[in-house]
Amino acid sequence: MGEIEALARRPFAAAWSRQACADEAERTDSIFLVADDGAVRGYVLARVFEGESQLLDLAVVEDGRGVGRTLWSALAQAARGRGCRKITLEVSEKNSRAQHFYRRAVAKVVGRRPKFYNDGSDAILMDFPLA
């Protein structure tokens, strides 16, 4: 959990503590997946609710290695397996890398929450349909 906690403290992260990660992993309505090749390379955390999966966090140690795509695909498969029709998420308007990643994954912008984050930036709301 220590490696995951460190990843959760990167810029734009929700700053999950070790205990929060452990608690979330124990929930029956959560999907918590870790990319691990002897060392943690990334993780994805989502919650399932009424046919939807809400992405809570997706983090990778290094960009451009395919770990994020692998985790996203695994999340989609796990969410489908739990009967979800879509993955919903929010991303900071300032986090262009994440926005690009989600758009490449075919997530669509469906709304905006003004001044959602502590720094006053808006949250961009996106949906990813699960066929």
Question: Which residues fall in each region the model found?
Answer:
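Conserved GNAT acetyl-CoA-binding A-motif
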Residues: A79-E90, R113
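Residue-level recognition of the GNAT/N-acetyltransferase active site
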Residues: V61-D63, E90-K94
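Short glycine/proline-centered loop/turn elements that form peptide/ligand docking sites
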Residues: W72, K94-A98, K115-G120
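Conserved hydrophobic/aromatic "anchor" residues
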Residues: F12, C21, Y43, F101, ...
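Conserved catalytic core of the tyrosine transesterase superfamily
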Residues: S30, K86, S92, I124-P129
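Acetyl-CoA-dependent GNAT
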Residues: G2-D63, R69-A74, A78-R82, P129-A131
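Conserved catalytic-core motifs of GNAT/GCN5-like acyltransferases
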Residues: E90, R103, K108-L125
